[in-house]
């Protein structure tokens, strides 16, 4: 009987909670959906959204960026939640500075916009380790993104943390806040297809777990393909999504990532996507019944510190409508703003019916929407990538440029065509102008440690790099000694032995007896590398010091626990009397990071711990420092590091990211790419033969009026004489 009474009490409590939530929803509004659209307060909406990632800009930049998004007629701001930024150590959370998620969402709310929160917690996003914290890799028994108990436990803890935080701050729409959508997982469909049953079980667990958190708004899964749990909305990602149809026809047609450009990888040209094609893709999606469209990215921003994914540049500009610095990219920004205005004029008709489609020619169509109240909207499309055509619609003639769509909000008058770009007058172009040059530099040469240097440890094996560093530093030293007899033939001939080092990546600097012998590096397509060349050695003890560097951790895939970096071998020395000596299994010593990192010479306190001298140019492993006063004005600032090699830079102790200016872009470029025809990330490329990135964003808010400390670490060998501070302007 006692158990029965407890059950009745529990049922009454559940009813009470349900009634309470219902009452709150009635007061503040609710979010749901039908086959046609997301419904807010029971009203169907055509929602235009843009991705802005809060850690990729500064809190001081957020209000202006959000306001420009609003001014462009967006309704929603979309962002990932970055697990490794918020929980860098297990159980120790961080929600301050650029990671102040609550502040970011409240600013969006103040601007009158909605939020789509992509909790994931896998992000991809060309972000270091896909947003996963590295400590997760070392949870016993873990396998990432599959039906694995340890992984699911940690994922649920973090997802719950975020949902509970949003509830506590009353940020969900039913609480009066801006969040109208959540996302669980990210682009998992291809992974599930690859791994089969464990992936399917994980998918359905993730959806159920998300729903159990009672966030009170719909959950989506993007790029989920065929296996879609009933309690989530499946959505599309890509350059085009007009043909996408949700698996369940009762769900709306949503596009979570319309790629406005593409990311830049070191050693490759800079991709861009013509404004006409972006506009065409949006109009085509809307005319085909789409009701939620998000630009990925609307503002890309900067990969500060070491947050960039593998071989991804520090700039995450993405050719977005707002550039890396938060300035409008013209004509893309204005062209899309005008598109949004036209679509909003059509919204009453769009949400009232399905389209009636008629052929206007061999490659032309009309999509017409109408409502019982008399509103009417038409989209006239020309899919031909080469030819403009004239079509007749409702007794009127319209000229449609190639690969374009005209929008008629009243089914009579064209107010917008995706291929007709009305640029601001006069035309606006961004440019970089030096504001401070001829800086007074000093330098400190870092140490090349050896096998018996202080702070090293020794093992008879080669260790995987991240197992040692836990990604606290990009660098790991591998050191061993080789003893050679004076009777070696190569010594008598005046020759040199051949050292071969195989590494899982990404960059290797080889020193023998303290002298640089050479470098090797991989690429995004092939991160593994092999250093193989002659090295200078003498009779007696020869000290080999290998500096292995990562350029971001992998951000795609599923078995993150298996990803390896660093020197894994084999390591061999050939050209000896004995033939080839295998060094792989002899004793190796290890040291994490550089001496300069250990001393924190990049901030004002640590800078005093080492002896600085005149600048040593074009030398490896050198730290450079200088000071400067902040230039006047409010224009965004950047460092021109085009004369440098590879390393990292800091302003007043804050890292502006990795630099790799001497990695020259290889490929075929077309600075006047034709907008018409299907776009891919390799269609339109610029800056071939130039540095993949030479300008590095310096946030204004990181500067003080006088005496700003600038520190640049150079791995390769650069020349600071040509380093300058520039301002970015639009004129």
From Swiss-Prot:
Q: Which reactions fall under this protein's catalytic activity?
A: Hydrolysis of terminal non-reducing beta-D-galactose residues in beta-D-galactosides
Q: Which residues form the signal peptide?
A: 1-29
Which superkingdom, per the lineage? Answer: Eukaryota
* Entry-linked Pfam families: BetaGal_gal-bd (PF21467), GHD (PF17834), Glyco_hydro_35 (PF01301)
GO terms, biological process: carbohydrate metabolic process
Spell out the catalytic residues.
Answer: 187, 257
EC number assigned by the record: 3.2.1.23
Q: Which InterPro entries does UniProt cross-reference here?
A: BetaGal_gal-bd, Galactose-bd-like_sf, GHD, Gly_Hdrlase_35_cat, Glyco_hydro_35_CS, Glycoside_Hdrlase_35, Glycoside_hydrolase_SF
Gene Ontology MF terms in the entry: beta-galactosidase activity
Keyword Signal assigned to the entry: answer is yes
Q: Which UniProt keywords apply?
A: Glycosidase, Hydrolase, Signal
* Keyword Signal in annotation: yes
Expression induction: By ethylene.
The cross-references to SUPFAM superfamilies, in alphabetical order and at most eight, read: (Trans)glycosidases, Galactose-binding domain-like
Q: In which tissues is it expressed?
A: Senescing flower petals.
Record-stated family = Belongs to the glycosyl hydrolase 35 family.
Instruction: Return the protein name.
Output: Putative beta-galactosidase
Q: Which organism is it from?
A: Dianthus caryophyllus (Carnation)
GN (gene name): CARSR12
